[in-house]
Amino acid sequence: MRTIVMTGGTSGIGEVAARQILATPDTRLLLGTRGRGQDGAESVRLDLTRLADVRSFVEGVNDRLGTSEIDALVLNAGENQPNGDGRTPDGFETSFVVNYLAHYLLLRLLSPRLADGAVVSLTTSGTHDPEEDTMLPPPRHADAALLAHPDRDPDRDAEPRVAAGRAYSAANLCTILAVRALALQPEVVAKNVTVLAYDPGPTPGTGLLRNAPAVANVAWRVFGGLLRRMVRRYNSKEAGGAHLGAIALGRVNPPAGRYYAAVRRDALTWLEPSKLARDDRVRDVLWRDSASLVGLQP
């Protein structure tokens, strides 16, 4: 029996991936959700804006696992905020927590339950890379303290939507750095765990822009097919979900030294992330400072 723990499996590419997982014999899916989950999945309550809820989710997963181990940990949830003013109950900027810090905490707390040869996948975005030239402003840094408390950042963008976009891209940069750091942890190395950053690319038809202005949200969700025909770089929700499902099911073997899996024109490719994402010093400082924010040792 293959056991998969997943966040972000109720809509968009995650919903497609979860259906694929649930259709696979001898596979068990534990799904973090704020509401109703997928039929056939074991739903465990999870609100990523609350770190206490993240810890409760881990307790629920551990209770359901019993003596079993996790064969795939798929952290796919994420969303874009309308501005940079949102704060979580812990006092941190919302986009930073939902798109990165909560998943960092999940990584730290669930890593001991990973099976030998397990797969860990964190969903990220090409917005982290200035060379991708996306619609969102690229990150300036991966300073966890400033991203958690952007009011302290002397270079914070004055325009709310620009600040929100940069918060999102910075959180996705942090995700890739965390993937690189996790792969170096002794318990992960000892278990021969595959750790990947998964970028589904721009994918109309998903709920990523649920917090955006109504016109943009409707266009993104409802007119996905038309947008894909107009902009060739856009991917389909079905392709993005199928690749994510294949990763979760252990059907993707990354080339040696590759960890950044990116969907481009519906095909899975292996790319180098941005220069900042490859900076070892930035990686190590982020891992340490993220631990401090969630009350753990590095």
Task: Spell out what each predicted region is.
Residues 274-298:
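C-terminal amphipathic/interface module of NAD(P)-dependent oxidoreductases
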Residues 153-165, 202-239:
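Alpha-helical membrane-targeting segments
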Residues 1-206, 296:
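Rossmann-fold NAD(P)H-dependent dehydrogenase/reductase core
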Residues 188-191, 208-212, 250-255:
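Glycine/proline-rich active-site loop of Rossmann-fold NAD(P)-dependent oxidoreductases
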Residues 135-140, 211-220, 262-265:
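Short, flexible, mixed-charge acidic loops at enzyme active sites
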Residues 60, 64, 247-250, 289-297:
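C-terminal alpha-helix
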Residues 224-271, 281:
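C-terminal helical subdomain
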